[in-house]
Amino acid sequence: MVTSNQLGFARLLMQLCVKNVQSFFLALLRWLSMQVSGAHVQQTPARKISRPESRTSKQKEGSRAPFTTPSSVNYHFTRQCNYKCGFCFHTAKTSFVLPIEEAKRGLRLLKEAGMEKINFSGGEPFVHQKGSFLGELVLYCKQELQLPSVSIVSNGSLIRESWFQKYGDYLDILAISCDSFIEETNQLIGRAQGRKSHLDNLHKVRNWCREYKVAFKINSVINTYNVEEDMTEQITALNPVRWKVFQCLLIEGENAGENSLREAEKFVISDQQFQDFLERHQSIQCLVPESNQKMRDSYLILDEYMRFLDCREGRKDPSKSILDVGVEEAIKFSGFDEKMFLMRGGKYVWSKADMKLEW
């Protein structure tokens, strides 16, 4: 007859057996799982994704780059313009302009990050609020931020003497775009409004710059319509502090390709044609040449949303706005080549107080 003690001992022995069997099978399952995982990793190596380099992949690469000081920044705060230049590479794709307090906040962020020079451009910067918005930004940058240099690029057609009277003291450099000293050529290019004389505006603004002590500069885009022109006599007479000579540039989505507002292919010249133009004008000491490569890599460009634009791939890939992520994060994706910036003479005497000009 089995006693109660014997039954209890048998029950305990059975429980121990069951636990040992469970432990054995759990260990076996873990071992098998590890073997299967290891085999899977060996059989399935990490895939290399083969696709064209995208903005996202470039941003990952950019995130490892050291911080770039934004010493000179070009702020295209509006895309609107009253001219229709056929090769324009910053076209009127939006009508957006930041509220002025937001624009000022972004400019302060840039100053805190090391900005010394701000250049306002467009579009045509005098279009918005008839130049008063631009004037207040110029005033803010010189008075409040105390930037060494504040400059503007304009076509000159909308500038009035009253603007110089109010804001001229705070502006260091005014660059006027002029591609030809032949009126018919300017009309063909689109550097005109109706039948008004672009050259008359150029000379008028030049005289105001002398009167109100603003350094005068000329920007010219060399293209199929003006590449054979000799501008030596006219540039010498106008005597700008700098004559920037650009090779006509194609930018996908702006003046070339699908969804572009311009078709600039017919304006494009070869590198040799550009070099011939430069050699024809080599006697002009203030000439600063800019080939396509220099233009793509050596400018810090902010769009109307205060996003840096990376033009290295022949298109404009935007960063996030400095208003959202700050300058240090956004500038990683600007595509900016500081060495090229210095090679093209990007850093020069850019404060009118240091230019020792004869007004």
Curated annotation (Swiss-Prot):
Lineage: superkingdom: Eukaryota
Membrane topology category: Peripheral membrane protein
Subcellular localization: Endoplasmic reticulum membrane
Molecular function (Gene Ontology), one example: catalytic activity
Region (Disordered): 43-67
Keywords, ordered alphabetically: 4Fe-4S, Antiviral defense, Endoplasmic reticulum, Immunity, Innate immunity, Iron, Iron-sulfur, Membrane, Metal-binding, S-adenosyl-L-methionine
GO BP, sorted A to Z: defense response to virus; innate immune response; positive regulation of immune response; response to virus
Cofactor: [4Fe-4S] cluster
InterPro entries, sorted: Aldolase_TIM, Elp3/MiaA/NifB-like_rSAM, RSAD2, RSAD2/Viperin_antiviral, rSAM
Disulfide bonds: none
Domain Radical SAM core: 67-287
Gene Ontology CC, one term: endoplasmic reticulum membrane
Protein family per UniProt: Belongs to the radical SAM superfamily. RSAD2 family.
Descriptive protein name: S-adenosylmethionine-dependent nucleotide dehydratase RSAD2
